[in-house]
Design a protein with these regions (language model features):
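Interfacial catalytic loop of ABC nucleotide-binding domains
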Residues: 76, 100, 121, 138-140
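Conserved structural motif at the start of ABC-family nucleotide-binding domains
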Residues: 3, 21-23
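Conserved ABC ATPase signature
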Residues: 140-144, 148
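ABC ATPase NBD Q-loop/coupling interface
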Residues: 14, 63-80
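The feature captures the beta-strand-to-loop junction immediately N-terminal to the Walker
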Residues: 39-41
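Helix-to-loop junction immediately C-terminal to a conserved catalytic motif
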Residues: 54
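Short helical segment in ABC ATPase nucleotide-binding domains corresponding to the A-loop/adjacent helical element
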Residues: 93, 102-110, 120, 124
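Conserved ABC ATPase "signature" region
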Residues: 117-135
Length: 151
């Protein structure tokens, strides 16, 4: 699987007084089997660039190609792109946003279009693997300890 960014530009709040260019004409190619490191100062655009790789956000201009195909050409194919390109955040415990532990873990499978039964099976299995039992399912994710959140 190769990923290409061609002249990628991303502008936040474009056309407003808060306009901020986060990425400016970035061109990059990642070949199949290649590993890269992305480093930079706070606010340099690292997270913005990463969010483009699986279509979480769309560029202001330029294109993202997955195996030569523009990922934004057909919005219906974004689900498949996201199955192929996953993101792992540095501090995943800061990415919690659902009201319950169960719903937070179910977010991914739900957005992949799994059935309710498959979602339940995946959530229970995932939580069991990391040692979080059913007594936590209906609690807020923010009631978990730091270690539990990371798991």
């Amino acid at each position: 699987m190769s990923i290409q960014l061609n002249h990628l530009t991303h502008v936040y709040n474009e056309g407003t007084t808060f306009e901020k260019v986060a990425l400016n004409d970035v061109t990059l190619e990642i070949q199949t089997g290649e590993f890269i490191g992305l480093i930079g100062h706070t606010g340099s655009g690292k997270s913005t660039l990463i969010q483009h790789l699986n279509g979480i956000i769309s560029p202001s201009s330029g294109e993202i190609l997955l195996d030569g195909e523009n990922i934004h050409k057909d919005k219906a194919k974004l689900k498949e792109v996201r199955r192929r390109i996953g993101l792992a955040f540095q501090y995943p415990e800061y990415q919690l946003f659902e009201m319950t532990v169960y719903k937070d873990v179910a977010f991914g499978p739900t957005n992949l279009g799994l059935s309710a039964e498959q979602i339940h099976e995946n959530v229970v299995a995932a939580l069991n693997i990391v040692g979080i039992d059913e007594t936590f399912y209906e609690k807020s994710p923010f009631e978990l300890s730091g270690g539990q959140k990371r798991r």
